[in-house]
């Protein structure tokens, strides 16, 4: 009898929960329509994979690509709609959040073509790779619109778990496993620190979890200037810092960038046609081919999602502690710009060089976060983030292509690449120059707008540090470009000497992404006004 009553209560509770969830989806589901498209793509991928006897179907790439493009289209149609809070205050929809969601979708859309040839070469499982990418994208999108502590914690964990799985995808490789373990341990520690900071805010505000309600709670409890808020600020800054990877929270970045790799069998002394699979040979040597598209994906999406979350957390709950978080972020920006660019000079691996370069780049982005809504700080940050996506992914596309064709990512092995593949060498040079901020490329105008906004806000010291470190970054980028263009015959390594020249017209999906990113890294800088206007229009 007791079991009967308990069973009936369980059924009633389950039905009530289901009806409430259905009610939320029915009335609030349209506000997360772009996310629903990705969820549908995930379900479709799983259904096809479970129902098909043939594994690793090549056209599976079409499903996530179509889902991402449709999600971008849905976001564009929703532009300039009134801000809405849905799902009982857990999720907020406005132009500011949507532009970050657009950037994340753009990153994922460009990263999928990078992975096609890579997965074919490594013979890795297609479905799982695409599932992880789509799920991470979904987590990043929910993080951009998160309006309470629970969503702010769960959404990045969704992204982070997929990132851990992607970084450890080549489980037979020792260095990949080592990098994944470091990434996992530091990620878990940072999440714990972040939650601890949330708990201080939760207690100080009288038990509120929504961002705006926390501000009201702090006013009611008169705790907005208490020591507990300072403790919460420190812990939350450390937790978010891991996602953004500024110095000194950057230790995982170079190791993960270099550790994510794969090993491919390449013949030692055969013709180019034999090396690329036209003939079989029984004797081969093992060479590293890197970096992977996983690194390209992690290098941009995590920073975009974390930047969106950081702006909302610092701007709303810590409204009364603006001087405190400004000081903390200024320290992080200075350390990132100086350490990132100085250490990048000494690197011999392209992956580690780009890792330290990204640490320096996030220092520039932090300037926009500090400036904030006033003086177009957020608009300059969004503009520079858009250019950074194209510059960084374009550079990674070039390096992925070079790695697939040569089996190396050592900087000295790029010597004389222009003599073998002018198209690839010029593309890499343009992306590196844009990252350095040389005119008239997009990176120059992005940095100019960012530094100008910082100068207008009175951040003179930060802007001067940014200018000096930009000159340092130009030095090590030009050093690589000089190697590409002027490598002497005796300096050309066997990797480039045996390089297979790529045709100007190619169906290679990596080259397609590379061309798109190179164009986006050069042309938009000439016509900045429309981009700036869109960024300014998105401010909340």
UniProtKB/Swiss-Prot annotation:
Key words, A-Z: Chloroplast, Membrane, NAD, NADP, Plastid, Plastoquinone, Quinone, Thylakoid, Translocase, Transmembrane, Transmembrane helix, Transport
Segments passing through the bilayer: 24-44, 57-77, 99-119, 124-144, 149-169, 183-203, 227-247, 325-345, 353-373, 384-404, 425-445, 448-468, 514-534
PANTHER family from the UniProt entry: NADH DEHYDROGENASE
Domain of life: Eukaryota
InterPro entries xrefs: NADH-Q_OxRdtase_suN/2, ND/Mrp_TM, Ndh2_N
Pfam families: Ndh2_N, Proton_antipo_M
Family recorded in the similarity comment: Belongs to the complex I subunit 2 family.
Protein's job: NDH shuttles electrons from NAD(P)H:plastoquinone, via FMN and iron-sulfur (Fe-S) centers, to quinones in the photosynthetic chain and possibly in a chloroplast respiratory chain. The immediate electron acceptor for the enzyme in this species is believed to be plastoquinone. Couples the redox reaction to proton translocation, and thus conserves the redox energy in a proton gradient.
Example of a GO cellular component annotation carried by this entry: chloroplast thylakoid membrane
Protein name per Swiss-Prot or TrEMBL: NAD(P)H-quinone oxidoreductase subunit 2 B, chloroplastic
Gene Ontology MF, one: quinone binding
